[in-house]
UniProtKB/Swiss-Prot annotation:
Disulfide bonds: none annotated. GO terms for cellular component: chromosome, telomeric region; CMG complex; cytoplasm; DNA replication preinitiation complex; MCM complex; nuclear pre-replicative complex; nuclear replication fork; nucleoplasm. SUPFAM superfamilies: Nucleic acid-binding proteins, P-loop containing nucleoside triphosphate hydrolases. It comes from the Eukaryota. It comes from Saccharomyces cerevisiae (strain ATCC 204508 / S288c) (Baker's yeast). Residues 1-22 are annotated as: Disordered. This is Minichromosome maintenance protein 5.
């Protein structure tokens, strides 16, 4: 019988050369000396750490492996090469030192209180021997990280350091370390100590098949007489022992699944994952979506579902003996974003880098430099690039006194014609953001974006597996083809975009995952291209609920402009002939652009070091401008006699605040000034307000000279020309009004569109026939 998962086991079939007791004693002595004697700058860090942990009843010790190299390279080499044998000895040494420290501390305390030190010492010794458990060794290391896909047979049973994303965590399970068993017939009790360090779930425990008291009595009787008396023997039957749970000892154990970081997965490859196990004080340290750095032992175990198992026919024989499944026995885990691999390269700032970033922040043209550095291969779209700079910087997160959180991340939607470089901008953001996940709307489901509940094939237990919004926690999610998503899948990210959490209540699992990400989405209008003769509501196939969660909405049009077309054509030709690279290198040398790596480091530095707040003058200016924006939207809605499909609510005021804070953050300014507010309002006017006010009737078209008054005059002429119940053809109206130069072609189309919306006319036969149906 076993308290561990029965599917996985290990058995020492071939005993190798094991160190004798003298060697073990020497190793334990070396570790004890290291704990007691190692110091940095006259401070005994491990002795003090152990004393503090004992006071708070934290029975663990965190050791930096680099300190072992400087103290004793031999024990460091033994620990690295034979961790499964050496770590239990290290933990024994820690426990012995802890007992010694506790005894000395209590004796000193007793002397200070004038008590009998001998009696106190004896009582304390016996108490500590029974109360202090075995301490856990937790390792930290600065060794080079090994990519997940580079782990091979050479690393088996060695300590490795690797990084990745936690995609699933199991519930805590209990693992027995000491079993107290009792015979159900004669009440004989005994105990079993379980050494389960080497296995993923501990060695399978087999209880004695017969009563040990019966065996002992038979042995003693055989010594007294050669002839045994059958009547005096006990017969407790087979398998008589039961486990006494109250007297047994257990430790916590948890299973994790680690996946490669998306940025490090080679093109065309699937991200790989690896099972991990941790126990005691390393459990419940991370949640799905956390980026971690792991120090652990790369080991293998025999899986029941592997080759040669009973399901494939043949019991446990065949190839199942040779083929093992790898796993990591965790010895140390760092779960902060700043210590994960992708941030590790950008958060270790040297003094020279910090000085360089401070000088860069004082550059009055920094805003333009960062804008020019965003996708330099794409011509134009300056406002969109500025919005992306704000998205990468982000605003300031706030926690209110009542515990409510206000997001600081900025969401941007690019909506427009094909061929306007929307996808290229998304790809560039994925490259320049320290943490980014790129996905396409058609290939993304609600579970793939948020989180899904999976069933472990071995244990049949349910566990959570994080989606794109969870894996990109602390970064950016780029969603291309946003309009191709199903409505029910798009609704799933509402909570993630505003509250920045994902609530799960599936299969008995109820939890909340963090999703502190910015969303950069790209979409096409309903008809493929944006139709100027239709309102934004007819062009945009999104609900108001999702649109209100975007801080900036850009409508990107492919307008026909000869001068602009010439500039774009020359830019594209330079890219294909290689001249653009030379120009970009020259601009980087001149300081008008910065490299991707430098920009990534500067963005990370700004996000870590700066959290601006609004000045009183900036806050007052924001408030008055928001009232003006709302009033302007109301006037537009009254003129068009319909509500805008792009809402301007209090969320948009918070959006302008976040944009203002991001503009101050890129300058490392702790206070957002009025000039930041002016630029934030200009960006908001150029994006969301421009999209909301794009009415086919009320707007002005400077290229054709069409105005609202011309459209109104045409409506009056058409009502006089066409009585109720009459019809005419589109070509007839064009000959009468356009060919005679009385009205423009655009005025004709807009007027017909407006009259149809007001149900004054009906367009039949694909718009070729106009029927007057109302007033």
């Amino acid at each position: 019988m076993s308290f561990d998962r029965p599917e996985i086991y290990s058995a020492p079939v071939l005993q190798g050369e094991s160190p004798n007791d003298d060697d073990n004693t020497e190793i334990i002595k070396s570790f004890k000396n290291f704990i007691l004697e190692f110091r940095l700058d006259s401070q005994f860090i491990y002795r003090d750490q152990l004393r503090n942990n004992i006071l708070v009843k934290n029975y663990s010790l965190t050791v930096n492996m680099e300190h072992l190299i400087g103290y004793n390279e031999d024990i460091y080499k033994k620990l690295s090469d034979e961790p499964s044998d050496i770590i239990p000895l290290f933990e024994t040494a820690i426990t012995q030192v802890a007992k010694r420290i506790s005894i000395l501390s209590r004796a000193q305390s007793a002397n200070n209180n004038d008590k009998d030190p001998e009696n106190t010492s004896m009582d304390t010794d016996s108490l500590l021997l029974n109360s202090l458990p075995t301490f856990q060794l937790i390792l930290n290391s600065n060794a080079n990280q090994i990519p997940l896909r580079d782990l091979d047979s050479e690393h088996v049973s060695k300590i490795v350091r690797l990084s990745g994303i936690i995609i699933s965590t199991s519930v805590l399970s209990s693992r027995a370390t000491y079993l107290s068993i009792m015979c159900r017939n004669c009440r004989h009790t005994t105990s079993i100590t379980i050494n389960n360090f080497n296995s993923i779930t501990g060695n399978t425990v087999s209880l004695p098949r017969s009563c040990l008291s019966t065996i002992e009595s038979e042995s003693s009787m055989a010594n007294e007489s050669n002839i045994g008396d059958e009547s005096t023997k006990k017969n407790c039957g087979p398998d008589p022992y039961i486990i006494i749970h109250e007297s047994s000892k257990f430790i916590d154990q948890q299973f994790l699944k680690l996946q490669e970081i998306p940025e490090l997965v080679p093109v065309g490859e699937m991200p790989r994952n690896l099972t991990m196990t941790c126990d005691r004080y390393l459990t419940n340290k991370v949640i799905p979506g956390t980026r971690v750095t792991i120090v652990g032992i790369y080991s293998i175990y025999n899986s029941k579902n592997g080759a040669g198992s009973g399901r494939s026919g043949g019991g446990n024989g065949g190839s199942g003996v040779a083929i093992r499944t790898p796993y990591i026995k965790i010895l140390g885990i760092q779960s902060d974003v700043e210590t994960s691999s992708i941030w590790n390269s950008v958060t270790m700032f040297t003094e020279e880098e910090e000085e360089e970033f401070l000088q860069l922040s004082r550059n009055p043209k920094l805003y333009e430099i960062l804008t020019n550095s965003i996708a330099p291969s794409i011509f134009g779209n300056e406002d969109i690039k500025k919005a992306i700079v704000c998205l990468l910087m982000g605003g300031s997160k706030k926690i209110l006194p009542d515990g409510m959180r206000l997001r600081g991340d900025i969401n941007v939607l690019l909506l427009g014609d094909p061929g306007t470089a929307k996808s290229q901008l998304l790809k560039f953001v994925e490259k320049v953001s320290p943490i980014a996940v790129y996905t396409s709307g058609k290939g993304s489901s609600a579970a793939g974006l948020t989180a899904s509940v999976q069933r472990d094939p071995m244990t049949r237990e349910f566990y959570l597996e994080g989606g794109a919004m969870v894996l990109a926690d602390g970064g950016v999610v780029c969603i291309d083809e946003f309009d191709k998503m199903r409505d029910e899948d798009r609704v799933a990210i509402h909570e993630a975009m505003e509250q920045q959490t994902i609530s799960i209540a599936k299969a008995g699992i109820t939890t909340v995952l963090n999703s502190r990400t910015s969303v950069l989405a790209a979409a096409n209008p309903i008809y493929g291209r944006y139709d100027d003769l239709k309102s934004p509501g007819d062009n945009i196939d999104f609900q108001t609920t999702i649109l209100s969660r975007f801080d900036m909405i850009f409508i990107v049009k492919d307008d026909h402009n000869e001068e602009r077309d010439i500039s774009i054509a020359n830019h594209v030709i330079n890219i294909h002939t290689g001249n653009a690279n030379a120009m970009q290198n020259q601009q980087e040398e001149n300081g008008s652009e910065i490299s991707i790596e430098k920009m990534k480091r500067y963005i990370t530095y700004c996000r870590l070091k700066c959290a601006p707040r609004l000045s009183p003058q900036a806050a007052e200016k924001l408030s008055s401008n928001f009232v003006t924006i709302r009033k302007q939207l109301l006037i537009n809605e009254l003129e068009s006699t319909e509500r805008s499909s792009i809402p301007i609510t209090i969320r948009q005021l918070e959006a302008i605040i976040r944009i203002t804070e991001s503009l101050a953050k890129l300058e490392l300014s702790p206070i957002a000034q009025e000039r930041h507010v002016d630029e934030a309002i200009r960006l908001f006017q150029a994006s969301t307000m421009d999209a909301a006010s794009q009415d086919p009737i009320g707007g002005l078209n400077q290229a054709s000279g069409t105005s609202l008054s011309e459209i109104r005059r045409f409506e009056q002429e058409l009502k006089r020309r066409l009585p109720i119940g009459w019809s005419t053809s589109y070509q007839t109206l064009r000959r009468e009004f356009v060919d005679t130069h009385r009205f423009s072609q655009l005025a004709l189309d807009k007027a017909l569109y407006a009259l149809e919306k007001h149900e004054t006319i009906q367009l039949r036969h694909q718009g070729q026939n106009i029927y007057r149906s109302g007033v």
